């Protein structure tokens, strides 16, 4: 086998081991398995445990999975043989469903006889509602629905990144509006610094793209190509960055030459924004003496379009930001905006890119507001907190079977564990609707078939190996906008 073929993705090997044995476990004469995905509501959670509630989620990332892994001819003779060999050793037994996969290869030319219906990407849906459903379209392939659970549930990651990023956008929007009276620059207030902090190149691409649903600033280049390939934008790129220093480009000049490093860098990038990490030795000395005195003449001459952005990168994030602002406020002319908050001159800004997650972000903007500093003065960079410090449990992303057909009879099925009512699952065929008041509601047990409830918001996105509906990244961004943004645009 050539190396290229060896490296090719094999859906037969992309499932949890136990699922390989499940075709032998369903009731005899099962002809349909219908399952759904949701971000479960936590009904009994002690509200004091978590500062952020995450009451709604951004649906994003299924389209990538369908296009990269599930569409087209995904079953071949070679892949069946490879899986057969692996599972014989892995289980030390011949448990693999070779016959079932050969059926898909022969009858459907290796295309998956599956239908997936999903809410439009970018939609913001309260927890506890159905987000997508999966069912087999060939009665012989009842076992296939939950075989692909494993890969489909990995959508938890882009959903969670997009949701957490949007919750941070809510915080920033609230404080920016309160301290400035407008939302100018909101989409550049949280910059993705997470490339090195994630577990893989693929994670970087997916996570960065999910953040870009809400914002436009990123240093995680991998997100750009993923969006271009799987979603598309009207603009040439969906995300932007600016020249910036790292510690090596400062410390390489030597400890006694930090001023020379700073001077060189701001001169190299005189007509665009430039971010300069300033804590290599002493952030407070850098702000007061180097920026505030020695190089002050170079800073005050910069344009509004090309500010110096000072980057602290150590210490307690809130304390450091406040002290940096205080020092800069003494060294540069501060004005008061229409809301009565202090504003640095337009050629000078701050970015805090260390220790930033949704909780510290809230603390910093609240602390700034209390000290009468406008959020206009600052932007944030977040890495691990944005792309890596998240799990499937944060939003309780879950995939469960809700309906089966056995011996020609449809049955609504569910789980309801005695020890955890939060884990109870939905019953029967599901649909998602909007009430006349505009709220989302999930109807169970096939009730959505009744016309009185209006259209189902779940649309077929995949059927029998084909992606049947796609969303552009621009549509997704529009769907995910904050209410506060829509109101501001309206005014």
Swiss-Prot record:
GO terms for molecular function: cytokine activity; identical protein binding; nicotinamide phosphoribosyltransferase activity. One of its GO terms (cellular component) is nuclear speck. The keyword ATP-binding does not apply. Expressed in large amounts in bone marrow, liver tissue, and muscle. Also present in heart, placenta, lung, and kidney tissues. It comes from the Eukaryota. Inhibited by FK866. FK866 competes for the same binding site as nicotinamide, but due to its very low dissociation rate, it is essentially an irreversible inhibitor. The modification Phosphoserine is found at residue 472. Beta-nicotinamide D-ribonucleotide binds at residues 219, 311-313, 353-354, 384, 392. It is found in: Nucleus; Cytoplasm; Secreted. Its EC number is 2.4.2.12. InterPro entries: Aldolase_TIM, DUF5598, N/Namide_PRibTrfase, Nicotinamide_PRibTrfase, Nicotinate_pribotase-like_C. Pathway: Cofactor biosynthesis; NAD(+) biosynthesis; nicotinamide D-ribonucleotide from 5-phospho-alpha-D-ribose 1-diphosphate and nicotinamide: step 1/1. It catalyses: beta-nicotinamide D-ribonucleotide + diphosphate = 5-phospho-alpha-D-ribose 1-diphosphate + nicotinamide + H(+). Diphosphate binds at residues 196, 247, 311. Its main location: nucleus. Pfam families: NAMPT_N (PF18127), NAPRTase (PF04095). Homodimer. Belongs to the NAPRTase family. Catalyzes the condensation of nicotinamide with 5-phosphoribosyl-1-pyrophosphate to yield nicotinamide mononucleotide, an intermediate in the biosynthesis of NAD. It is the rate limiting component in the mammalian NAD biosynthesis pathway. The secreted form behaves both as a cytokine with immunomodulating properties and an adipokine with anti-diabetic properties, it has no enzymatic activity, partly because of lack of activation by ATP, which has a low level in extracellular space and plasma. Plays a role in the modulation of circadian clock function. This is Nicotinamide phosphoribosyltransferase. The lineage of its organism: Eukaryota, Metazoa, Chordata, Craniata, Vertebrata.
């Amino acid at each position: 086998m050539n190396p290229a073929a060896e490296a090719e993705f094999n859906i037969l090997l992309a499932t949890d081991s136990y699922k390989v044995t499940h075709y032998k476990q369903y009731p005899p004469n099962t002809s349909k398995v219908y399952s759904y995905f949701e971000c479960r509501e936590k009904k009994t959670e002690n509200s004091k445990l978590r500062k952020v509630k995450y009451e709604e989620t951004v649906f994003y990332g299924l389209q990538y999975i369908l296009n990269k892994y599930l569409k087209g001819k995904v079953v071949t003779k070679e892949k069946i043989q490879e899986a057969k060999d692996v599972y014989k050793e892995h289980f030390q037994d011949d448990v693999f469903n070779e016959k079932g996969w050969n059926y898909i290869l022969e009858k459907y030319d290796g295309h998956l006889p599956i239908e997936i219906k999903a809410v439009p990407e970018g939609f913001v849906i309260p927890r506890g509602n159905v987000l997508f459903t999966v069912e087999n379209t060939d009665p012989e392939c009842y076992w296939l629905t939950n075989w692909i659970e494993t890969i489909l549930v990995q959508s938890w990651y882009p959903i969670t990144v997009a949701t957490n990023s949007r919750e941070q956008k809510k915080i920033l929007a609230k404080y920016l509006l309160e301290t400035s009276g407008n939302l100018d620059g909101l989409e550049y207030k949280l910059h993705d610094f997470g490339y090195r902090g994630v577990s893989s190149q693929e994670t970087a691409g997916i996570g960065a793209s999910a953040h870009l649903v809400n914002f436009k600033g990123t240093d995680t280049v991998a997100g750009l190509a993923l969006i271009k390939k799987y979603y598309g934008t009207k603009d040439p790129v969906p995300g932007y960055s600016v020249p910036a220093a790292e510690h090596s480009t400062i410390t390489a000049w030597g400890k006694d030459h930090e001023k020379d490093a700073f001077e060189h860098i701001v001169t190299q990038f005189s007509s665009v924004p430039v971010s300069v990490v300033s804590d290599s030795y002493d952030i407070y000395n850098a702000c007061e003496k180097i920026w505030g005195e020695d190089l002050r003449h170079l800073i005050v001459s910069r344009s509004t379009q090309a500010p110096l952005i000072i980057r602290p990168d150590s210490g307690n994030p809130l304390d450091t930001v406040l002290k940096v602002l205080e020092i800069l406020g003494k060294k540069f002319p501060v004005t008061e905006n229409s809301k009565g908050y202090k504003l640095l001159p337009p050629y000078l800004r701050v970015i805090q890119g260390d220790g930033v997650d949704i909780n510290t972000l809230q603390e910093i903007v609240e602390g700034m507001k209390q000290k009468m500093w406008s959020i206009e003065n600052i932007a944030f960079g977040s890495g691990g907190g944005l792309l890596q410090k998240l799990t499937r449990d944060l939003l309780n992303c879950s995939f469960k079977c809700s309906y089966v057909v056995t011996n020609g009879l449809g049955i609504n099925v569910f789980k309801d564990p005695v020890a955890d009512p939060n884990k109870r699952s939905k019953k029967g065929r599901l649909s998602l609707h909007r009430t006349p008041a505009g709220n989302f509601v999930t109807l169970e047990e096939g009730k959505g078939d009744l016309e009185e409830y209006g259209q189902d918001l779940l649309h077929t996105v995949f059927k029998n190996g084909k992606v049947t509906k796609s969303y552009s990244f621009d549509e997704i961004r529009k769907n995910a906008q904050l209410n506060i943004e829509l109101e501001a645009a309206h005014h």
